Amino acid sequence: MKARYIFLVMVAGLLVSCTKAVKVTVTQEVINPCYLGNGIEWDPYDEAIPWGAALSDEDWNTLYERLDYMQPQYVRCMINSPFTYYTGKGFEDGRNSENIKKLLEYCQSRGVMVVYGEYNPPAWEMKGSKEWVEASVRHLNWLVAENGFTCIKHFVIFNEPDGNWASTNGDFAFWKEMVGRFQAEMDKYPALKGQVDIAGPDAVIDYANPASEYDAEGWLKATVENVPEVGIYDMHAYPGQRYVRSGEFEETLKKLKAMVDKPVILGEVGFKYFSDPADSTLAQEYWKRVEGHPFTKGSDCNMMVYDDFYALDMPLLLMSVMNSGFSAAAAWMLDDAMHSNGDSGRIEDIKLWGMWNILGAEVFEDPSQEEVRPWYYTWSLMCRHFPAGSKILELEGDLPENVASTAAQLPDGSYSVAFVNYGSESHPIDLKLPVSFEGYSLQTYHSGLEKKPVSNGRFVLPAQTFAIVSK
């Protein structure tokens, strides 16, 4: 496969040698002066406990090694309290805490910003209870103050409160009230007051719950205008392929960003290939793969995570995030082993969205699921080469159809420029940086990673390829 790809690149180079190069210039015009970075949803394997398959030291070391390559700049970590601090009769902070401690120890040691939170209250009837607010904040303080996990910077009190699947069922007034109550409780703890703020509204872009007075845009607008306790704005997005590739998704993000005067991040992001009629071919393939699958029913999964094109779609989506002025995005999600649908514990219907399944052999009797999937590589490059504190910059140049790009100046003064060519034709690129190319390299992904020096900014961008120029 590698030899075939090299041959195709050589042929592409000959075919485009007489084609005028696409000039792309990195300017000093700033889109975002302090990008927070790209990251991943990494939840603490709550269901491994009832599955009777605790992660081994070997599993954890594998996770750490893969994450060290990725260098996520932030992690979104959400818990289900019935698996952790809620016993069914009361509250116990240290209950089943081994996994979340290992997860947060990693983030603390690597300086990774953590957005921590709860999917829902322990029971839906507890959603407004004083006991839950006190216990939830006490558990947060236990993590931050007593265990030293100061990497936790933001707190999500309800996951996707606009949704009809949430205990809030789109009730904005109730959510607003609860934000105030949680903030008042957090202010009682010195380790939390002024150190951890609330992230919200955590609403899903392009979704509207008929039971709610607001759609997602309305949720964000109402939060900006009426919920001053929120320290960082947080949304979720699951667009389709046409929506992203057409540029419409980026325009939606720009419209949302124009409403806010603080950083806004995507707490969850991924693709749903069955929401747009234009993606019908992908939808048909999706449901074909779901049929008879041994460990998912298709109710909450993405069967395309195994494909090379997903390794192009995900960084392409990130380019829309970065170029729109948003400040971060966390991919949903790191590992299939983190959740079953509805957190029911049913191994025949897991949320198959990950870069691998670390319990593929132990729980699912399929060791091949533990192998790294293609999109891990391109997402990792977008994490490690656009670190926190980078300036996202405007590009000048007329990019060809089916090619997208984003650029940044890093905190060390160097530059990173990423490209995705999701079309069927190769293109010669003539890239101009504000500095010389000494020490820079070109990394590409097309069914595998390749790396070589780039001395003058000129290179061929093959069809169906991700590329990044960086130090």
Predicted segments — roles?
Residues 16-17:
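C-terminal motif of bacterial Sec signal peptides marking the signal peptidase cleavage site
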Residues 271-380, 393-401:
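Aromatic/acidic polysaccharide-binding cleft in carbohydrate-active enzymes
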Residues 172-317, 324:
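Noncatalytic carbohydrate-binding groove/subsite architecture in carbohydrate-active enzymes
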Residues 455-471:
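C-terminal beta-strand-rich structural cap/linker in extracellular carbohydrate-active enzymes
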Residues 434-449:
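Solvent-exposed beta-hairpin/edge-strand motifs
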Residues 398-436, 464:
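Carbohydrate-binding surface patches
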Residues 67-242:
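Substrate-binding cleft and catalytic face of glycoside hydrolase catalytic domains
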Residues 21-63, 71, 78:
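Boundary/entry segment of secreted carbohydrate-active catalytic domains
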